Amino acid sequence: SFLTQLELEKIPMIDKAGLAILGNDNFLLESLNKKKGQSYIDDYVAWTISSSKCLGLKVINAGGSEVFKQGVQSFELDDIVPTYGVSSRQILKALNKANENLKIEHPLHVHCNNLGMPGNVKTALDTIDASEGRRMHLAHVQFYGYDDKGKRGFSSGSSELSEKINKNSNITVDIGQVLFKPTVTISSDILRQFNAKKHAKPNKWIISEVEDGGGGIVPYFYKENNFVNALQWVIGLELFLMIKNPYQVFLTTDHPNGAPFTSYPELLRLLMDLDFRNSQISKINKSAV
């Protein structure tokens, strides 16, 4: 974390900050397993934030990196982490309570389980319910806006997800819009990156498993004639346009996972210019519209 702060200091002009990542580390999981209590976890979170000098707290696929070591490929909110006997939901709720108890200004920043998987909109909806009214920020929700209907088993769940967000003022989100171009996906969600490596373009990738987490770097090319990519593009725009409160939704491409941040002008035009948006819709895979 010290080296990270030194590197951030070298970046000029823009505001920058870090989020400390917990949710797959032995200390937390063991504390939950041994029922150490919420105040014990609060102290651990406080020490982590203070030591790392971070702005807030993030959880990435709570328990997912740990179950990856057991050969698991998907992990639901109520699935149990082997060895520790705690569920992803328990991890999430404990960290969210700590974030609230410590009055950390940034809400718990959540990378939900089952990113990129058909039907994962249910996971996102369950995660919102797990907040129990506490503040929570869901990251790159476009990647959780997927239902599993239709003959291809992949469809838009944006209507259901946006409706849920509209009804829960404690929730904020950023979109993680996909745009059609080559990019590189970088994530600490090792389950997702391991599953995605077969789609690497070019076919070079890195997967790293470490004691308290993991992740990977996988290059990818989003193409407008690809059904899945086109539907991802549509779902992101639908979420932008159907979430009613602009203070609940943040404009992002989840740089660089959906697209590089240099694509923001294109994204802004897509949202603000109906004629341009319609012209771009006419170019994508027709099955996705």
Feature-to-residue mapping (PLM):
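Active-site microenvironment of metallo-dependent hydrolases
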Residues: S1, C112, M242-V249, H255-V289
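Conserved residues at the C-terminal ends of beta-strands
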Residues: S1, L22, I60
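Metal-associated gating/positioning segment near the N- to mid-region
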Residues: S1-I11
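A short acidic, amphipathic alpha-helical/loop segment
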Residues: L3-Q5, E30-S31, K122-T127, E266
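Divalent metal-coordination and catalytic microenvironments
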Residues: K16, L22, L57, H111, ...
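Active-site mouth loops of central-metabolism enzymes
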Residues: A17-D42, T83
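Internal, charge-rich low-complexity segments
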Residues: F27-L32, P182-K197, E266-A288
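Histidine/acidic residue-rich metal-binding segments in metalloenzymes
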Residues: K36-N61, S65-V249
